[in-house]
Every structure is written in structure tokens, then in C-alpha cells.
Amino acid sequence: MGDHHDFINSGSWWKVSSSSSPSSSSSMRASSIESGGSAVFHDKLHHHSLATDHHLQMIGLGLSSQSPVDQWNQSLLRGDSKAETSFGVMLQENLNLDATSNANANTTSSTSSYQLQESDSSHHHQALWRDPQSDFKPQILTSGGNRGFFLDHQFSPHGSSSTDSSTVTCQGFAVDNSSNAMYAATTTTPNSSSGMFHHQQAGGFGSSDQQPSRNHQQSSLGYSQFGSSTGNYDQMASALPSTWFLRSSPPPKPHSPLRFSNNATFWNPAAAGNAGAPPPHDASSNFFPALQPPQIHPQSFDEQPKNISEIRDSSSNEVKRGGNDHQPAAKRAKSEAASPSPAFKRKEKMGDRIAALQQLVSPFGKTDAASVLSEAIEYIKFLHQQVSALSNPYMKSGASLQHQQSDHSTELEVSEEPDLRSRGLCLVPVSSTFPVTHDTTVDFWTPTFGGTFR
């Protein structure tokens, strides 16, 4: 896993150049690295040349002047310390271990050929492919558990195995693929991979030393058209766009049960086990434990209406009590108004007044109301006569009236004058006032002081 973090930090560039010599067939020799380091091997393409001994040219941060069009200048991925220190020695050892068994199979079209070189000692396999019509040659390095490939403008998959690690390089972008999955492929297992090609790693490429190849006739094949067979590669004949494989990071690994175990707390096991879905409140309690306290709120909401209803009941009771308090008062007022007790009291007052009037008019007379009133009238008339007799000397018009009066009236007036004067009475005779016969009794008995009569 740590190999993909080692990028272009080694500070050295390398290039594989091939010496141009006429040959009968086109081939390419690729060597694998035994250590953890990864490298890219490419040679120059010739339409009519055989693959001869290739040599590696190590240059420092520069480009080779030979065949700049046909060569790749790839960045060296830094691997283990062994690859950094003795890189040339390792390359020389890999060149010495090449080619003990070769298998050449010609396809139906004359444009492609395979050459397989296998080392018996280290069990390294190298699959070489060359297209005379293409100037760019991708190469795939596959290991026991790790796979990688190199891409250019056109893609053609081929495999060669190394022991430790592999690298995916695409036009200067280098990515180490430490997983067992192939780029642009589906989920893989440690023993098999689906996608570009399927490979069993029990016995290398296969039980035999030779690697058979299949004819490629279709111009475009999907990933699903590649089947898996023991010891065989199912490869594509036509070139695929390199942008499919240009990735700056390895593909995401398939989700393992451990990752799902992190989210296991959010799922309801009852919902997965049972066919029927649980009630919504159970699901909410399992999915969101933080939402469980709001379940108490409906209880508080239920309690609040109860409290409100209790308050309303208490207020209604108070209103009823107040109404009961007011109702007796109204009933009392009605009973007092309807009861004969106030009339009886008024009757008592009237009787008292009649008794007092009877004491004034005729103390020794009858006590009934009619007789008391008649005596009161006669007494009032007597008083008027006394007033007129006493006021005649003070009034000019009252002389005639004085002659008409009898002598006993004058005697009574003289006898009663001290009493009237002692009481402070100031009586005016009726004759001196407006005639009573021409006016109402009300105006007579209640004259307007300081004004004239009507």
C-alpha cells in the first residue's frame, strides 16, 4: 500500500532505446524487476525489425536525442532502497535472466504478434506485443498479487509478471496499484479478476511453459466480452482511448463488511429480518437516537391541555360560584321588592304620621285616618284666618276683610299672637295672595319665592 505514495521523487529519468537493425518480425523485450521498485521499459518501434538486445540508458533529468518521437520518457517511481542503490545491477541481472522459452503465435491479422519469454529460475513471464502500424506501445506488468499497465494514445493489454510490485504508468502519470483489482474493471478477488483479463496465480500463467494466444477479429470489444480461462489472457485487439485509464489515484476498493459495520448502528435489524416494515416511530428511534427525547414532548403537550382544561374548569367553577353569589343578591332584591315587608313599613310610617297629625289637630279626637284628615283641614283653615287677622294692620287692602271678621276671631288672634310670635311664625293671609279659586292647589301650596305667580 505504501508504494503508490512514492512518486517522481527519485530525481532520475531512464529510457529504453533499441538499436535499429533489419529484422523479420516485430517484437519487444520487457524485463521485470524483482525488488519493490517499478520501472517502465519501452523500445523504439520499427516496421521491419526484430527485437534485439535492448540496453537501458540512464540519464539525469534530461531527454535522449535519439528518436524523440518514438520514445517514451517516463518518470521513475521510487521503490525500496535496493532499487535506488543498485538499479543498474538489477537491470543487468534481469537482462541475463531473459528468454529460456519463447512462444510466438501469429494472429489472423498480420498487424499484431505476441512473443512470450519466460524465465525458469525466477518464474518471471514477459508478454511482448508490437503493432507495426502504431508508434506507441503500452505494456502491462503483472505480479502475483499486484497488476499494472502502461498506456499511451492507444491501448493494447499485455501482461508480464514481476515478483514484488507493479506500476501503472500513463503518459507521465505513474500510479502504483497495490490492490488486486484491475483498472477499469469490476470488483476482484485475490485469486481471480474480472475486467481486462482474468488470471489464475496458482501456477504462474499456466501449467505449461508456453502461452497460447487468441485471434483478435473484432475492432471493439467491451469489458464484459472477455472471459476467464485457466492460464489464458483474453485481450483486446482494437485500441481503446487512453483517457479511460488516466487516473491519478488507484480505483476505490470494494466496500468490505467492516466498512458497513461502521454504519450498522443506523440500520434497523428488525427491518432487514422481517418482511414487514416497522412502525415509523420505531424506525425513527433506531435511525436517529437523538430524536427520542421529542417523544416526551407529546406527553407534555397532552399535559398542557389538561392543565388548561383544569384552569378552565376552575374558572368556570369560580364563575358559577360568583353567579351563585350574585343570584342570591338578586333574589333578595326581588324578594324585598315583592315581599310585603316594605309596604308594611310604609304603612307603619304612614300610621305614625297620621298619629302625629292627630296629636296636632285633635289630640283627643278620633284616631282613624279619615277623621284625622278632616280635623287637619279644619285646623288649617283656622290657622289661615288667624294669619289674615294678624296681617291686616300691615296690609292696606286687608281693611275690608277685617270688618267682615267676627269678634271671636279677633279674640283668638290676640290670644294666639304671643304663641305665634314666640314660635317665630311669619304667616301671610290668604287674601293678600293670589286667589286660590283661580289657581291650582299645587301652585297655591307651593308658590315660587322671589317671583310672580302664573
UniProtKB/Swiss-Prot annotation:
A molecular function (GO) term: protein dimerization activity
Keywords recorded for this protein, A-Z: DNA-binding, Nucleus, Transcription, Transcription regulation
Start-end of Polar residues biased regions: 185-195, 207-228
Gene from which this protein is expressed: BHLH123
Feature: compositional bias, Basic and acidic residues: 303-324
Region ranges (Disordered): 101-127, 185-228, 270-348, 398-417
The protein's name: Transcription factor bHLH123
PANTHER family membership: TRANSCRIPTION FACTOR BHLH123 (PTHR16223:SF46), TRANSCRIPTION FACTOR BHLH83-RELATED (PTHR16223)
Cell compartments where the protein resides: Nucleus
Subunit (UniProt): Homodimer.
Biased composition (Low complexity): 101-113
InterPro entries: bHLH95_bHLH, bHLH_dom, HLH_DNA-bd_sf, IND-like
Main location: nucleus
Residues in bHLH domain copies: 334-383
A Gene Ontology term for the protein's cellular component: nucleus
